[in-house]
Amino acid sequence: MAVPNELKYSNEHEWVKVEGNVATIGITEYAQSELGDIVFVELPETDDEINEGDTFGSVESVKTVSELYAPISGKVVEVNEELEDSPEFVNESPYEKAWMVKVEISDESQLEALLTAEKYSEMIGE
């Protein structure tokens, strides 16, 4: 199962890619495989503030609805609108096409609490 080294991970199976002061957030390959076929993705609006640990959306699969938890705090600067019409991208390409939001980081110290690829792999038993 893919766990890209350049990303950081949350205990709730979100991944974070940091570029400057912007973090791109999505869910991991492990998370999408546990959920099954994704049929709907609900995301926040651009300019919404999200707070670490709070829900910022949800992913609905044929099995269940799963909340998305913000791994960091900040202002949403971009939302992946393609997921509205193509939620299957979450299954097909969780680390590329299926990024969910881009957030302007408000507290960089929160990044230190995220897991490395190695630690995340251990957590999911890979």
Curated annotation (Swiss-Prot):
GO cellular component, one term: cytosol
SUPFAM superfamilies: Single hybrid motif
Residues with N6-lipoyllysine modification: 63
Required cofactor(s): (R)-lipoate
SS bond list: none
Pfam families according to UniProt: GCV_H (PF01597)
Function: The glycine cleavage system catalyzes the degradation of glycine. The H protein shuttles the methylamine group of glycine from the P protein to the T protein. Is also involved in protein lipoylation via its role as an octanoyl/lipoyl carrier protein intermediate.
Family membership noted in the UniProt record: Belongs to the GcvH family.
Subunit record text: The glycine cleavage system is composed of four proteins: P, T, L and H.
Protein name: Glycine cleavage system H protein
Species for this entry: Staphylococcus aureus (strain bovine RF122 / ET3-1)
Gene name of the record: gcvH
